[in-house]
């Protein structure tokens, strides 16, 4: 196809699966990792050009962008998962989460948009989460970052689509990529939320262990990229069509009780 794609967080999970899918379809793929030299040879995707990028570091973003050249597709996938009661989340941890999950991807998007407009073609995919559409307890900071990404993408579609540049969001539901092992958790010693939080995390881990594969999400990302007019939102996994239908039909208070019950919480 001759098009160049950038996939952030390409060393594992959704990013790795997306990079592999795009290489198979003939794209030139630049995959990012904070430490690409640490990716074992047998964990690398053949055909992917790995480059260093730390989305929390403005200097790293600037250095990465300076060496890019033309980019036709950007998949903003890199991010961190975080959990904890709002009252006990360290401010510096929340700030870092927003730098990694929101501000870094937006800076990268701003860097590639002018070239896409000039060539009258571009695709930007924000890898979000269904938690942005269905907020969960103890996931306020993470859900807020994913809602912010979607908000940027939905609004910017109006600005960029006249130039042939389409922004879209892919929202996976529960996905089994090992992210639960890397999730950062914050809970004060003696917290009044301890029992509630412990039950919630156990239910969440169980659901994610039964979740869809990264390949399933990658297939949806590729479908969005290759659509003539990508939709604003693609949701995949966790019975997405049913869940979004239920959200339209049920009052918010009923939906809150349903989410609480599914995660072992009494409300």
Regions found by a protein language model. Give the residues of each.
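Conserved glycine-rich cofactor-binding loop
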Residues: 11-12
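Conserved NAD(P)H cofactor-binding loop of Rossmann-fold oxidoreductase domains
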Residues: 77-82
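Substrate-binding pocket helix/loop in short-chain dehydrogenase/reductase
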Residues: 85-86, 93-95
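Active-site helix of classical SDR
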Residues: 109, 145
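Residue(s) in the substrate-gating loop at a strand-loop-helix junction
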Residues: 129
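Active-site-adjacent segment of SDR/Rossmann-fold oxidoreductases
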Residues: 134, 155-166
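C-terminal beta-strand-loop-alpha-helix "lid" module of Rossmann-like NAD(P)-dependent dehydrogenases
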Residues: 161-208
């Amino acid at each position: 196809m001759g098009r160049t794609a950038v996939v952030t967080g390409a060393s594992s999970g959704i990013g790795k699966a997306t990079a592999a899918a795009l290489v198979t379809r003939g794209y030139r793929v630049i995959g990012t990792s904070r430490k690409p030299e640490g990716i074992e040879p047998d964990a690398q995707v053949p055909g992917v050009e790995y480059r260093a990028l730390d989305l929390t570091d403005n200097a790293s973003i600037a250095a990465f962008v300076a060496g890019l050249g033309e980019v036709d597709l950007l998949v903003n996938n890199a991010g961190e998962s975080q959990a904890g009661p709002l009252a006990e989340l360290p401010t510096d941890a929340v700030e870092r989460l927003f730098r990694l999950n929101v501000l870094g991807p937006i800076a990268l998007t701003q860097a590639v948009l002018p070239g896409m407009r000039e060539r009258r073609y571009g695709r930007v995919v924000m890898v979000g989460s269904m938690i942005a559409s269905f907020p969960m307890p103890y996931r306020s900071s993470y859900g807020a970052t994913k809602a912010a990404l979607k908000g940027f993408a939905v609004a910017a579609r109006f600005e960029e689509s006249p130039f042939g540049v389409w922004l879209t969001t892919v929202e996976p539901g529960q996905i089994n990529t090992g992210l639960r092992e890397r999730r950062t958790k914050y809970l004060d010693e003696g917290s009044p939320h301890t029992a509630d939080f412990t039950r919630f995390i156990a239910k969440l881990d169980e659901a994610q262990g039964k979740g869809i594969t990264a390949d399933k999400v990658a297939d949806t990302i590729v479908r969005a990229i290759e659509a003539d007019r990508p939709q604003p939102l693609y949701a995949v996994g966790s019975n997405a069509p049913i869940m979004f239908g239920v959200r339209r039909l049920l009052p918010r208070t009923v939906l809150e009780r349903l989410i609480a019950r599914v995660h072992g919480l009494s409300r």
